[in-house]
Amino acid sequence: MDNQVFSGIFARAREQHPLVHHITNYVTVNDCANITIGAGGAPVMADAREEAGEMTGFAGALVLNIGTLNSGIIESMILAGKVANERKIPIILDPVGAGATRLRTDSTRRLLDELTISIIKGNAGEIGVLAGAEAKVRGVDSAGISGDPVTITRTFARETGITVVMSGATDIISDGNKVLLVDNGHPLMGRISGTGCMASAVTGVIAAVEKDRLIAAATALAAFGLAGERAAAASRGPGSFKPALFDAMAELGPQDLAADARVRSA
């Protein structure tokens, strides 16, 4: 892939400062807001049923994250998602813990059934379960998947018409036809809570300015992974890594993606 493509998209996000509406979890809500700002966007978190749809109408993207779900939150997600679909606003779904409990799995399937999702991003266990593969989820973390991850990701994308991201040491992205692999990132990103949620937030920023969902997801994950690499170089461990990650994301420029994004075709 030509890194100038990712660089140009990231520059647009920095210039346009898109509003991204998050209905997310209370574990990482502040992290998602701050990483959205760092990536060039403007965050808003409105999960009340009385305003979720109205707020979505102002946004460039909608991010739905089921990390701490309940029945009221799911209804707000449906209301917001329907407005997004009516106005052709992209929806990014992060099915945190899908496969771990019946509530999480059923709620994710309901969102997939009732809404047109643009991008779904999950770990190997979450995507594997939703794709019908043999996979395990322990809490909100992947506990393994049986089968070829690239094939599972591509097939799930083809069957649903959704751009699918299976996150991992190498992120796998497919629109059902093409498959892109993103190698940016650092092991410290897996040693703090919330980096998966933050990756979805950054994806919302980029999807708000780029209609090609495959390229948008690759741009977002390369940028976030690159920020993780730079934060790790300035850190002593998980405690110092987290604030360094926000600094690195805020300091990242289009020229950094042009030089250091590592995205390849499968």
UniProtKB/Swiss-Prot annotation:
Q: Would the keyword Transferase be found if you checked this record's keyword annotation?
A: yes
Q: Which reaction does it catalyse?
A: 5-(2-hydroxyethyl)-4-methylthiazole + ATP = 4-methyl-5-(2-phosphooxyethyl)-thiazole + ADP + H(+)
Biological processes annotated in GO: thiamine biosynthetic process; thiamine diphosphate biosynthetic process
Q: Which UniProt keywords apply?
A: ATP-binding, Kinase, Magnesium, Metal-binding, Nucleotide-binding, Thiamine biosynthesis, Transferase
Coiled coil segments of this chain: none
Q: What is its EC number?
A: 2.7.1.50
Cite the binding residues for ATP: 121, 167
Entry-linked Pfam families: HK (PF02110)
Q: Does the keyword tRNA processing apply?
A: no
Name the pathway it acts in. Answer: Cofactor biosynthesis; thiamine diphosphate biosynthesis; 4-methyl-5-(2-phosphoethyl)-thiazole from 5-(2-hydroxyethyl)-4-methylthiazole: step 1/1
Q: Which cofactor does it need?
A: Mg(2+)
Residues where substrate binds: 45, 194
* One GO MF term: magnesium ion binding
The protein's matches in InterPro entries, at most eight in alphabetical order, are given as: Hyethyz_kinase (IPR000417), Ribokinase-like (IPR029056)
Role summary: Catalyzes the phosphorylation of the hydroxyl group of 4-methyl-5-beta-hydroxyethylthiazole (THZ).
| Record-stated family | Belongs to the Thz kinase family.
NCBIfam families, per this entry?
A: PRK09355.1 (NF006830), thiM (TIGR00694)
Q: What is this protein called?
A: Hydroxyethylthiazole kinase
Q: Which organism is it from?
A: Methanoregula boonei (strain DSM 21154 / JCM 14090 / 6A8)
List the taxonomic lineage. Answer: Archaea, Methanobacteriati, Methanobacteriota, Stenosarchaea group, Methanomicrobia
